[in-house]
From Swiss-Prot:
Spans annotated as Disordered: 88-110
Protein name: CRISPR system Cms endoribonuclease Csm3
Function: CRISPR (clustered regularly interspaced short palindromic repeat) is an adaptive immune system that provides protection against mobile genetic elements (viruses, transposable elements and conjugative plasmids). CRISPR clusters contain spacers, sequences complementary to antecedent mobile elements, and target invading nucleic acids. CRISPR clusters are transcribed and processed into CRISPR RNA (crRNA).
GO molecular function term, any single one: endonuclease activity
GO biological process, one term: defense response to virus
Subunit record text: Part of the Csm effector complex that includes Cas10, Csm2, Csm3, Csm4 and Csm5.
Species of provenance: Methanothermobacter thermautotrophicus (strain ATCC 29096 / DSM 1053 / JCM 10044 / NBRC 100330 / Delta H) (Methanobacterium thermoautotrophicum)
Keywords: Antiviral defense, Endonuclease, Hydrolase, Nuclease, RNA-binding
Gene symbol of the encoding locus: csm3
Keyword RNA-binding part of the UniProt annotation: yes
Keyword Cell inner membrane annotated: no
Length: 245
């Protein structure tokens, strides 16, 4: 199996609604949030883990292609999802389709999803807003007892709508591969019509991929024998057609 090229997909993730990607709370703070969001430990600003993006894309594609069994991810090692997103080495689990032949492994994972960090423009907007603290707003909600109507108020931190994060996805192509880039773009489209993070059915987590650039770097690029080529600059995923893919 020989490496052929990488596709570099870059752009911005625009939060159309508030975004909540939670983190475990190790301490209780006076006036703190009941449900904090994940933050960069250095800057104390929110970011979007690459694992959150990749995991959501994979789960949506598995549902679309009927590759889910017993609630677990596909582990067959043969299908296009296993090829692009990788398959677990342990095939003994009963959750999800499993590989039946150890020689059927599809090789290295073809996708790398980097952590997405807020753009400089967004950081400045956060600083100027009196309602945003360390990149987050507090959303107050109530849980009502159906019998007594007693309210149980709580709050959640979330990244405010309109925030932008820079993203980068690398899609590799090896001998015999033909549609890795198409599968990744399909996963991104599915994600736009779903949600990222928690509380998505209550309006959180609607995102859009904007200002997308796709570059192609053949193996010769890494040997210093050739340059990269730009496949296109696109305002949105809707502008990327089959020919571009």
């Amino acid at each position: 199996m020989r490496f052929q090229k990488n596709y570099i997909i870059t752009g911005e993730i625009l939060c159309r609604t508030g975004l909540h990607i939670g983190v475990s709370k190790d301490s209780i703070e006076i006036g703190g949030s009941d449900n904090p969001i994940i933050r960069d430990p250095v800057t104390r600003l929110p970011y979007i883990p690459g694992s959150s993006i990749k995991g959501k894309m994979r789960s949506l594609l598995e549902l679309e292609l009927d590759r889910v069994s017993n609630g677990g991810p596909c582990k067959c090692g043969k299908c296009e999802i296993c090829r692009v997103f990788g398959s677990a080495a342990d095939s003994s689990s009963s959750s999800g389709p499993t590989r039946t032949d150890s020689s059927s492994s599809s090789g290295p994972t073809r996708i790398i999803v980097r952590d997405a960090f807020p753009t400089d423009e967004t950081v400045e907007e956060w600083k100027e807003s009196s309602e945003v603290v360390e990149g987050a707003e507090l959303k107050y909600e109530n849980n009502l007892n159906r019998i007594t109507s007693m309210a149980n108020p709580r709050n959640q931190e979330r990244v405010p709508r309109g925030s932008k994060f820079g993203f980068e996805i690398i899609v590799s192509e090896y001998d015999g591969d033909s549609d890795n880039l198409r599968i990744v773009l399909e996963g991104l489209r599915l994600l736009e019509d779903s949600y990222l993070g928690g509380s998505g059915t209550r309006g959180y987590g609607k995102i859009e991929f904007k200002n997308i650039k796709i570059r192609e770097r053949p193996v010769e690029y890494y040997r210093g024998e050739a340059g990269e080529s730009t496949m296109g600059d696109f305002e949105s995923l809707a502008d990327i057609n089959t020919t571009a893919e």
